[in-house]
Amino acid sequence: MLSEAEEPREVATDVFNSKNLAVQAQKKILGKMVSKSIATTLIDDTSSEVLDELYRVTKEYTQNKKEAERVIKNLIKTVIKLAVLHRNNQFNQDELALMEKFKKKVHQLAMTVVSFHQVEYTFDRNVLSRLLNECRELLHEIIQRHLTAKSHGRVNNVFDHFSDCDFLAALYNPFGKFKPHLQKLCDGINKMLDEENI
């Protein structure tokens, strides 16, 4: 038989667990609502066009609709999670410094993507692949404390695809079937650069 001192503790534990479950359920519901509102503010028309074009070129390159959807969904989820962490002041000073470095690296990547398209005979797939992998490493460092192994896997899925030298060579082939996709991608990225969204 339980002593009187043990009974209230057991009851308090039951109450705590129930409240904890309720709070978790609320967070999950709120999280979905917040994610949707953040997604619409983060992904403007230009970003959406770039993502759509990335999807089309990925689908055509891989010949696999599900794989293309997975890569783009993982990209969107990663961007949204990063934005949620940043907007909720979850990063420490070191992570904020890494975030600034990451933003500069992404800007450099965007400028390089466009430059390689605009200036003939400058394309170097190894340069683009290296820049993409540098972005990947910075991103892993930034989210290390905050996100799960599954999220790190999503990051790898996105960067494994886009940093693949064969994919980049096919995308930038001046006589290849992806030339129209590259033009649309660069138009969108140029617009994002002009609007200082990247």
Curated annotation (Swiss-Prot):
One of its GO terms (biological process) is apoptotic process. It comes from the Eukaryota. Residues 49-83 form a coiled coil. The keyword Coiled coil applies. Disulfide bonds: none annotated. One of its GO terms (cellular component) is cytoplasm. InterPro entries: TNFAIP8-like, TNFAIP8_sf. One of its GO terms (molecular function) is cysteine-type endopeptidase inhibitor activity involved in apoptotic process. Gene3D superfamilies: Tumor necrosis factor alpha-induced protein 8-like (1.20.1440.160). PANTHER family: TUMOR NECROSIS FACTOR ALPHA-INDUCED PROTEIN 8, TUMOR NECROSIS FACTOR INDUCED PROTEIN. This is Tumor necrosis factor alpha-induced protein 8. It comes from Mus musculus. The gene is Tnfaip8.
